[in-house]
């Protein structure tokens, strides 16, 4: 059960970050570069998972994306896609709770980029897409990586939304936190609980240290760029 929970946790965390990254980059760019009506409201909605109880998030996902949910039922009828009580639902839960952290890190990185660089490229005839992929995205890459690391760490620790939305099924939805929950309720399973706890602490600490290193690297690069200007 331990190895299965560890492998599933890593798979869920990586998958949730890869699937949510394109949307996170787009949303971060939209919030950093555009002014539009309702921007504050959208920002608040995006950051709701940071303040809502995870159980509430899980319930909302169940209502919306469950097999009988107002979105999930059409996904199941038309494409045979079901999120409830499957590892895909665990990926979705992790992606939702980690999404604000990824967006915030990328947005801060974008806001620190000198917009004059983008304007100069456009003046020289570069298209908006070319400016984004050759200037904006490369310069924001440290922030993107930092956001991914933070989101990965948050996904590893997700419990409430996952157990509410997809239950606690060994080998299918039972990630490290859910496996620890099961072990805690099992007499004589203290050793297994301690091993999973230690693994989670080490992995989370490595993720946070990596995120901090990437943030400092980003600040150093931006500082060098300002000196060069």
Curated annotation (Swiss-Prot):
Pfam families associated with the record: BPD_transp_1
GO terms under cellular component: plasma membrane
Transmembrane intervals: 12-32, 45-65, 83-103, 132-152, 196-216
Topological relation to the membrane, as annotated: Multi-pass membrane protein
Localization terms from the record: Cell inner membrane
Highest taxon in the source lineage: Bacteria
CDD domains: TM_PBP2 (cd06261)
Major location (coarse): membrane
Keyword Transferase: no
Disulphide-bridged cysteine pairs: none
Keywords for this protein: Cell inner membrane, Cell membrane, Membrane, Molybdenum, Transmembrane, Transmembrane helix, Transport
Domain ABC transmembrane type-1: 6-214
Function: Part of the binding-protein-dependent transport system for molybdenum; probably responsible for the translocation of the substrate across the membrane.
Family the UniProt entry places it in: Belongs to the binding-protein-dependent transport system permease family. CysTW subfamily.
NCBIfam families cross-referenced by the UniProt entry: modB_ABC, PRK09421.1
UniProt name for this protein: Molybdenum transport system permease protein ModB
Organism: Haemophilus influenzae (strain ATCC 51907 / DSM 11121 / KW20 / Rd)
Gene for this chain: modB
């Amino acid at each position: 059960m331990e190895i299965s929970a560890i492998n599933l946790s890593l798979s869920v965390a990586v998958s949730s970050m890869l699937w949510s990254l394109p949307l996170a980059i787009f949303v971060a760019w939209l919030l950093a570069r555009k002014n539009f009506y309702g921007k504050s409201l959208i920002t608040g909605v995006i950051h709701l998972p940071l303040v809502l109880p995870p159980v509430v998030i899980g319930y909302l996902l169940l209502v919306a994306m469950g097999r009988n949910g107002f979105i999930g039922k059409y996904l199941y009828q038309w494409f045979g896609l079901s999120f409830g009580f499957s590892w895909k639902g665990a990926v979705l839960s992790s992606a939702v709770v980690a999404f604000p952290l990824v967006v915030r890190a990328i947005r801060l990185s974008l806001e620190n980029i000198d917009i004059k660089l983008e304007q100069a490229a456009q003046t020289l005839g570069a298209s908006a897409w070319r400016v984004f992929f050759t200037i904006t995205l490369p310069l924001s890459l440290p922030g993107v990586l930092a956001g991914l690391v933070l989101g990965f760490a948050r996904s590893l620790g997700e419990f409430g939304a996952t157990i509410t939305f997809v239950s606690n099924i060994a080998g299918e939805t039972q990630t490290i936190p859910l496996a620890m929950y099961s072990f805690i309720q099992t007499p004589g399973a203290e050793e297994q609980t301690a091993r999973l706890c230690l693994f989670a602490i080490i992995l989370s600490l490595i993720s946070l240290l990596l995120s901090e290193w990437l943030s400092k690297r980003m600040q150093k690069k931006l500082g060098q760029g300002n000196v060069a200007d």
